[in-house]
Amino acid sequence: MAPSPEGVTVVLGAQWGDEGKGKLVDILAAEADICARCAGGNNAGHTIVVRNDKGEKTSYAFNLLPSGLINPECTAFIGSGVVVHVPSLFNELDTLERKGLKVAGRLFVSDRAHLVMGFHQIVDGLKEVELGGSSIGTTRKGIGPAYSSKASRSGLRVHHLFDPTFPAKFRKLVEGRFKRYGHFEFDTEGEIEMYLAFAERLRPFIVDGPTFMHNAVNSGKRVLVEGANALMLDLDYGTYPFVTSSSTSIGGVVSGLGISPFAIKRVVGVIKAYTTRVGGGPFPTEDLATVGETLQEVGAEYGTVTGRRRRCGWLDLVVMKYSTMINGYTSLNLTKLDVLDGFDEIKVATGYKIDGVEVEGFPADLDRLAKVEVQYATLPGWKTDISNCKTYEEFPENAKAYIKFIEDYLGVKVQYVGVGPGRDQNVIIF
């Protein structure tokens, strides 16, 4: 199914990230006019593999740029809620163009997007060292410190690059970091010179962000929004403080792009058939024994950006119910179902108890969350290779039962099912 012809389609991560959003975005972007990023920075990441007419494969890595650029007819937009590390943006752009992807005239950046500077990245590392054993496990890309600058009203936005006061504002920001963290090695004047050079290269891409999106929506363009990270990493609704620094929920789409909530017609929640998490923080269904190791190995669970091993465990429907409540998914994309092919039995978390009392919702207090006793339902496995299934009817009955169990618990239909890493390994149910 294509993006909504009468509004905006949003793809959001429903767990702790790494659900496989990029693959669905890639598929939907084939029929989109505009693909937009609304939040986050180059801390997100996924790889798309494209096969040409000769059967040759080309791999494209996306971190900051919207992956809709794969479609030569699609325009990409980086919204006001994104934080942009300009050197990384052009490095990614140059890499894509060296692989034959023509981007000229198809990429636009909001003038209101905040900038990630080199000192933000240094500070990111210093903060992690300072936290020691309580570190959050960031990607050290400077995302958090850039959002901190934004929240404290001292950050620099894209349009500031063309302001004569940019060098003075930049120096003031660096001096503030020196006062906080001590004098670290940083070439302030060299960084200013580099950014002023980048500014001229960036100029053709810059637009008035809210006006760009308003015109797109009002002219009937098919808009696809590519969410970054996931709901459980949201600054307000995730497992705070083990979260990212932006709004990764449906609310972040509205504020990050400057669009009306009434423009959004479809919200697809992407949910992995089991659960993974990178870095520190609560993970009620984490399995540190055989199950977790099997999921990690079979699912090749290593972070796209950091290369870190992902923590693994059974699907947590308590998390998913909470995620669904906040984001209001109109349908689901269940990914990596094939990873469960080898299990005799599959467990699914259906509730939490603390001291024998059922917990309503998802606890905000991490001390309470650490005490939960996870309640599981056990479903029979299917012990069949489903990686070649092309239709829902081809799935084993127990795989269908697993999908239905999820649908019944959440009250949302599964629309897409991923059965392998390939673009063509995606079953569309409706």
UniProtKB/Swiss-Prot annotation:
GO terms for biological process: 'de novo' AMP biosynthetic process; cellular response to cadmium ion; IMP metabolic process. Binds 1 Mg(2+) ion per subunit. GO terms for molecular function: adenylosuccinate synthase activity; AMP binding; DNA replication origin binding; GMP binding; GTP binding; magnesium ion binding. It catalyses: IMP + L-aspartate + GTP = N(6)-(1,2-dicarboxyethyl)-AMP + GDP + phosphate + 2 H(+). Pathway: Purine metabolism; AMP biosynthesis via de novo pathway; AMP from IMP: step 1/2. GTP binds at residues 17-23, 45-47, 310, 336-338, 418-420. Mg(2+) binds at D18, G45. Its EC number is 6.3.4.4. GO terms for cellular component: cytoplasm. Pfam families: Adenylsucc_synt. IMP binds at D18, E19, G20, K21, N43, A44, G45, H46, T139, R153, N229, T244, R308. Substrate binds at T304, V305, T306, G307, R308, R309, R310. Homodimer. Plays an important role in the de novo pathway and in the salvage pathway of purine nucleotide biosynthesis. Catalyzes the first committed step in the biosynthesis of AMP from IMP. This is Adenylosuccinate synthetase. It comes from Cryptococcus neoformans var. neoformans serotype D (strain JEC21 / ATCC MYA-565).
